[in-house]
Design a protein with these regions (language model features):
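Class I SAM-dependent methyltransferase Rossmann-like catalytic core
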Residues: 1-41
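Class I SAM-dependent methyltransferase SAM/SAH-binding core
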Residues: 33, 38-101
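A short acidic, Gly/Pro-enriched loop at the edge of an enzyme's catalytic core
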Residues: 99-111
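A short glycine-rich, Lys/Arg-flanked "PGG" loop and its adjoining helix->strand segment in the class I
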Residues: 124-139
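Conserved class I S-adenosyl-L-methionine
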Residues: 139-167
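Short alpha-helix
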Residues: 167-190
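Conserved catalytic loop of SAM-dependent methyltransferase domains
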Residues: 187-212, 220-222
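C-terminal lobe and adjacent flexible extensions of AdoMet/dcAdoMet transferase-like proteins
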Residues: 209-268
Length: 268
């Protein structure tokens, strides 16, 4: 993993500022639309998100869950709850480390990780914590920058290599998929987003055609990938009890009734 410049503070907080730039707003729109799709058929009571709350307000409004909890290493990301269509959801913010969630086991219906894995040292431990707090059939939705793209190449630029979002880890979709599988989290869907290169504002409007072309011709090279996985719990198969006893063969090849052996034969 590349090391982010410590003078910039928390890389996730720096990422939140980057989302306000022209390029960051392009990414935020694509990720917000994707999250809204992935949350469309996700139900439950408790939704947990680690950081970047401001970038996903539209998706949160459309979410069917009533309680939303935002976690983060700082409390700057927490915003007041906003009404959803005909209802309102509660919003709470708690300071926490991503690999030590202050939540009970099997207590959360869905978890959102917006680039959390990109900027944590122990990404696998974060997923392990997510698996712990999810209920059976609960879902995790995560976003990561794709190193197998022009965005990944930009991370090797000397001027950008220690600044968010370029200083994060090099997690490929395949590695993340392997980790999920090892933890019993079954990958349901994966989407590739943002096929235009990370160029300045003057060129962004001229590259809209790359989004359609990228989805069709080089889908694995999107600058961002999103994954939704579900926690599968295998049910134990009970052993079938042996209620009947094997009949004993008597002389003359007659079969002894089991009822007589159990004392239930009628007297005669």
């Amino acid at each position: 993993m590349k090391v982010c410049d410590p003078r910039d503070g928390d890389p996730l907080a720096t990422l939140a500022k980057w989302y306000t730039t022209p390029l960051g707003r392009q990414v935020a729109r694509a990720e917000n639309a994707c999250l809204e799709r992935l949350l469309g058929d996700t139900f439950g009571h408790y939704l947990v998100q680690f950081g970047a709350s401001g970038q996903f307000e539209d998706a949160a409004r459309a979410c069917r869950m009533r309680h939303r909890l935002v976690l983060g290493e700082t409390l700057n990301e927490c915003r007041p709850g906003m009404p959803t269509a005909g209802r309102s959801f509660s919003l709470a913010c708690i300071r926490s480390q991503p690999d030590r969630l202050p939540l009970a086991s099997a207590s959360v219906d869905a978890v959102i990780l917006p680039h959390t894995l990109d900027f944590c040292v122990q990404a696998h431990e974060v997923l392990r914590e997510v698996e712990r707090v999810l209920i059976p059939e609960g879902r995790v939705i995560l976003f990561c920058f794709n190193p197998l793209s022009t965005w990944g190449l930009m991370r090797w630029m000397p001027r950008r290599s220690r600044q968010a979002p370029w200083c994060g880890g090099q997690l490929t979709p395949f590695r993340v998929g392997d980790w999920l599988r090892l933890l019993g989290l079954q990958q349901e869907t994966r989407e590739m987003l943002v096929f235009r290169p990370p160029l300045q504002r003057a060129y962004l409007s001229q590259l809209d055609w790359l989004e359609t072309a990228g989805m069709r011709y080089w889908p694995m090279f999107g600058g961002v990938f999103a994954v939704r996985a579900v926690k599968r719990v295998q049910a134990l198969t009970p052993l079938r009890p042996s209620w009947t006893q094997r009949a004993r063969i008597l002389p003359g090849r007659a079969v002894e009734p089991t009822a007589r052996k159990n004392g239930h034969a009628s007297s005669g």
